[in-house]
């Protein structure tokens, strides 16, 4: 069984709705379980112990939420321990910009995580299309975590 961590921040519930759709996708994959956690309650041990991770944030001033950036700052010391884990990003916001998503994807790259799929950007209230895309994102991430867990380690 692989565990996929879904770390998110949501003030209005929009990003949380996307996170719940990702959880639904993860749990639709046999052999995968999801752990949904607000980033302000997450620890670096949550990051270390998972097999894959999804990061979700609102778009604040064309960037991820400060509490998400704070989590990455705290996790810097364990970067080598999480390198290679499959990951994805998703964002919500009032604008049409994908800059918050790009900021999360830069962190994914900086931590040498594996980008398992392109992220999802939702504008305003998540649409059914956004929720379907997030469910698919969760499925893809869970399948990649399972594939990676089956690769023999040297």
Model-assigned labels for residue ranges:
Residues 2-26:
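N-terminal beta1-alpha1 ligand-phosphate binding loop
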Residues 18, 67, 100, 130-133:
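Residues at alpha-helix caps and immediate loop-helix transition turns in enzyme cores, especially N-
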Residues 18-26, 104, 137, 141:
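Hydrophobic residues within alpha-helices
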Residues 20-32, 109-112:
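Short helix-loop-beta junction
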Residues 34-36:
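Generic structural signal for residues in well-ordered beta-strands
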Residues 39-117:
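Helix-loop-strand module that forms the ligand-binding subsite of alpha/beta enzymes
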Residues 43, 115-154:
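Glycine-rich phosphate/pyrophosphate-binding loop and the adjoining helix
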């Amino acid at each position: 069984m692989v565990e996929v961590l879904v770390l998110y921040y949501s003030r209005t519930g929009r990003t949380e709705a996307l996170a719940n759709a990702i959880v639904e996708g993860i749990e639709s994959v046999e052999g995968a379980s999801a752990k949904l956690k607000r980033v302000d309650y997450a620890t670096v041990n949550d990051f270390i112990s998972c097999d894959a991770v999804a990061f979700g944030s609102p778009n604040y001033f064309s960037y991820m939420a400060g509490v998400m950036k704070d989590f990455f700052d705290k996790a810097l010391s364990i970067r080598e321990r999480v390198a290679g884990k499959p990951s994805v990003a998703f964002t919500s916001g009032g604008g049409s910009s994908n800059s918050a998503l790009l900021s999360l994807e830069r962190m994914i790259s900086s931590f040498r995580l594996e980008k398992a799929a392109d992220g999802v950007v939702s504008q305003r209230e998540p649409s059914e299309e956004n929720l379907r895309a997030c469910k698919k994102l969760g499925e893809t991430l869970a399948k990649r975590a399972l594939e990676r867990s089956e690769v023999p380690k040297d």
